Design a protein with these regions (language model features):
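Amphipathic alpha-helical binding modules
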Residues: 72-136
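N-terminal low-complexity, intrinsically disordered segments
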Residues: 1-50, 56-89, 93
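Short low-polarity hydrophobic stretches
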Residues: 50-51, 110
Length: 136
């Protein structure tokens, strides 16, 4: 994935891309939470692939504010909507406890990976991430 494609995809995942009629906007990471239709693991792996593609750009002296905002938004809003007991999904009993735990794991992984990339340690950033393996 090119950095340009990763940037565009992250904007869809965060719901900040201006093309709101594109299916990627509705089916992205935050789109799957509002309205809640269940967790889609491929969205998590897609965000992680975007981070890998953008790792060099995120270590520069100047970084793209839209990319950082998208990553921050994904983590912040997923916590507010789906992980927090007062969030719309938990307070309305729309998300199971198992899905809350899984969403929390994903958000922590995205947040941690972003931190290590911004801190300049790409190897450490992806150390605990295991991408999906093809089925035999």
């Amino acid at each position: 994935m090119t950095p340009e494609a990763a940037r565009e995809l992250l904007l869809f995942h965060s719901g900040t891309h201006p093309c709101v009629d594109d299916v990627r906007w509705e089916q992205g990471f935050l789109g799957m939470l509002r309205p809640y239709r269940g967790l889609r693991e491929e969205n998590f792996h897609s965000v992680m692939a975007c981070l890998r593609a953008l790792a060099d750009d995120l270590q520069g002296d100047t970084i793209d504010r839209a990319v950082v905002s998208a990553l921050w938004g994904i983590c912040h809003l997923a916590r507010a909507w789906g992980i927090s007991p007062e969030g719309m999904l938990r307070s309305n009993d729309l998300i199971s406890g198992d899905d809350v735990s899984r969403l929390q794991d994903w958000v922590e992984q995205i947040s941690s990976t972003t931190f290590f990339i911004l801190d300049g340690d790409v190897d450490e950033a992806f150390d605990s991430y295991g991408p999906p393996q093809p089925e035999a």
